[in-house]
Structure formats: structure tokens, C-alpha cells
Amino acid sequence: MRSRWSRIAAVVSAVTVVIGMTACSGSGDSDELLVYNAQHESLTKEWIDAFTKETGIKVTYRQGGDTELGNQLVAEGDSSPADVFLTENSPAMAAVEKAGLFADLDQGTISQVPPQFRPATGKWTGVAARTTVFAYNKTKLTEAQLPTSIMDLEKPEWKGRWGAPPVKPDFQAIVAAMLQLTGEAATAQWLAGMKAGGQIFQDNIATLRAVNDGQVDGGVIYHYYWFRDQAETKEISNNTALHYFKNEDPGAFVSISGGGILNSSKKKDQAQKFLTFITSKAGQEVLENGTSFEYPVASGVPANKALIPLEQLQAPAVNPSDLDSQKVTDLMTKAGLL
């Protein structure tokens, strides 16, 4: 049986869902916000339900992927009907920011999130976080045999033994962090090693399933896919464990899910309230107490008790505004991974 998260992952993208309404009418009346949502749908629905209950402001959302919706916003420019953009990863936020499409956030919203989880520009903010991990099959690898660094995976001894989903924005964000931290030459070499010796999978779930089934010894994914399956059926994670690279390794990259307000929005006050709520204690407790298993980023809100605390991950310092999605696409295409 496929897990609930597998079914969610299979839902067709780019559909418009309406909260508290029977039909979607774009950005609608003065109290209704339109969110372009690339974050997981179930989490955003929890945020919207809680926000509408507290404020009475109705919210609609258009579901899609990071790259898809980011490119759509850039194409729409000042004519976009969107009021808010939410993503799973930072590169799409950086692309929209570089296009000059974000409005400044209120200082009150910005101050709720520590500097390491938002860009210094104040054009958008982190709303959640997820960490890179190496999921490994416990029957194939001991802890002593695990790679010290994610960079080790391009070495000959790992050929054919690991995999990842290069077509997904999640993995591309990891490569963007690698590019920022190690430079173009090292990143290109690593991608060439992946092409020569890594197994290619459709997404994080398929990667984890392949590790669990013993198709590969290990795989690079985001942590919460493992925790979600562990909390449900353990169908695709029962034979696996997680390895955290730590030591400020590129493989310890913590990816920031972002939220920003579009300059073109005619409902900036309501949009500010929405982002202020998401990053408030009440909004972040949805992460702490829910089953998304993503990390809260607001000050004073701990992670779900099942997770390793963020401060213990020893993540490298990365500037989220400088995660270069276009350069990553170019490098991955040149390596034959896209």
C-alpha cells in the first residue's frame, strides 16, 4: 500500500484550491488573498485554516512546484494576480527577488525569524526549514562505512551504490548550496561523478524506497520524508536510518522554505498579516506539533520532538539570496543530469 505522503506527492500540480469558498475567482474580493504555493499542500492548508480562523481573511492558493511557479511569476511580472509566494526551497525565491518582484516585508515580520533563516535584503523570509541527509540501508552499511562528506559520493568506491532525484527542486537546492560553498569546478566534478556513478530517481520518495529495498546502499534526500514514513507505515523506510553529515559540510545544508509578498499585490496589508502569522509562534507551532516534520524557523519555537534540534545539525552558512538556480541548471544540464 502506498503511504499517504506518496499519494499526496502524486497529486497533479498547478490546480487552484479554494479555502472557505466553492469556486476560485482569482484574487477575488478585497479580503481574499491568492497564494502561489510551492510548499507542501497539506502544510499550507493548515496555515491557511488557522489564519482564516484568527483573522477572517479568506485565502486561495494555486499549487505548483518551486521552479514552475517561480518562472510563472517572472513571466507574469507586474501583471501577476498572486499576492504571496511560498516555496519549499530558496532558489525560486532568489530568482523572483532578482527579478525585482518582491515588496519589502514589515520589520515586525522579519524580526520574528533569526538572520540565518532569511536573506539580509528583507525582501522575503524563511517560513520553514529542512535538512539534507543521507538515508542508508542498515543491512548494507554500518555507521563506520558511511561517507564523511557528501563530496565523497563522487569517488569510485561509491559508484553504483547511491542515488538521488536530480530533476527535483529539492536536490537542485542542495547543488546550489554546494556551488556556493565549494565553487563551480568542485561542483561540476561532483555532478560528473553523479552522472557516472549515481542512480537517478524520480523524487525523494522513490529514492528512499530504493534505499529501503536495497536497490542502492544510500541516497541523498531531505529528512522529513523519512520521518513522515516512520510516523505512518514505515513502508519505505523500515530498513533504513539517516546519516547527518554535520561539520558544516555541503551535505549538512539546511534549505529554507520562503515566503514573500509580490510588488504587484493590491492586498499588501492582508498579505503582510498572512506572513506575519505564518512566522509567529502560533504559525510555527503548526510545524512543531504537526506531522509535516519540517523545522520551525521562528525564534523560541522548538522542532518536533522526533527531530534533531536545528542547532545540532552543524549546517554550513549559506546566503539564500545567492543560491543560483540558473547556474545549477546549466551545470546539471552539462553533466547530463537534466
What are the functions of these language-model segments?
Residues I19-A23:
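C-terminal motif of bacterial Sec signal peptides marking the signal peptidase cleavage site
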Residues S25-S27:
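Bacterial signal peptide processing site
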Residues D29-W47, R62:
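Extracytoplasmic "Venus flytrap"
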Residues A38-K45, T67-E68, V74, S80-V216, ...:
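Extracytoplasmic ligand-binding site segments that recognize negatively charged/polar headgroups
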Residues P91-A95, G218-N239:
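A ligand-binding cleft/hinge motif common to bilobed small-molecule-binding domains
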Residues R130, W158-P165, L191-M194, I200-F201, I236-N263, F277-G300:
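Periplasmic-binding protein-like
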Residues A135-K140, L179, V254-K267, V286:
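A bilobed periplasmic-binding-protein/Venus flytrap-type ligand-binding module shared by bacterial periplasmic
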